[in-house]
Amino acid sequence: MAKKVIAYIKLQVKAGQASPSPPVGPALGQRGLNIMDFCKAFNAATQKVEQGLPIPVVITAYSDRTFTFITKTPPASILLKKIVGIQSGSKRPNTEKVGKVTRKQLEDIAKTKELDMTAADLDAAVRTIAGSARSMGLVVEG
């Protein structure tokens, strides 16, 4: 018989740095899941990813207190900030521009995020990422 799903828990945890402290501990503790098992498994799964990069994770909690999890790619805004080398986006994106991003850089991000995006093709994914860049106050070139 299939296990009964009791909850889906969505978190953003830094790659290789999962620990029992918030937000991981309280979210898993409420469901009665073993926090250290998750931390060890997550840190092992994100070992090849750049350390400290926030990774979205969806944890499926089952009624027998077991869990599975799926890691996703980092948010586009984080990847854009990393490429451009800024700490945060513009507070007024339509008037204050904080950096420039090229079509090639957008394509690289779109290829990275391809699995998590619902875009029909690479061009649609690039347009989506370009929209995120503009809303952060970045100038899209090309």
Curated annotation (Swiss-Prot):
The entry's keywords: Methylation, Ribonucleoprotein, Ribosomal protein, RNA-binding, rRNA-binding
Molecular function in Gene Ontology: large ribosomal subunit rRNA binding; structural constituent of ribosome
UniProt function note: Forms part of the ribosomal stalk which helps the ribosome interact with GTP-bound translation factors.
Pfam families from the UniProt entry: Ribosomal_L11, Ribosomal_L11_N
Reported modifications of this chain: One or more lysine residues are methylated.
Superkingdom in the source lineage: Bacteria
Span of the signal peptide: none
Record-linked PANTHER family: 60S RIBOSOMAL PROTEIN L12, LARGE RIBOSOMAL SUBUNIT PROTEIN UL11M
The keyword Ribonucleoprotein appears for this protein: yes
Organism phylogeny: Bacteria, Pseudomonadati, Pseudomonadota, Gammaproteobacteria, Lysobacterales
Stated family: Belongs to the universal ribosomal protein uL11 family.
Single GO cellular component term: cytosolic large ribosomal subunit
CDD domains according to UniProt: Ribosomal_L11
UniProt xrefs under InterPro entries: Ribosomal_uL11 (IPR000911), Ribosomal_uL11_bac-typ (IPR006519), Ribosomal_uL11_C (IPR020783), Ribosomal_uL11_C_sf (IPR036769), Ribosomal_uL11_CS (IPR020785), Ribosomal_uL11_N (IPR020784), Ribosomal_uL11_N_sf (IPR036796)
A single GO BP: translation
Protein name, entry field: Large ribosomal subunit protein uL11
PROSITE patterns membership: RIBOSOMAL_L11
Encoding gene (name): rplK
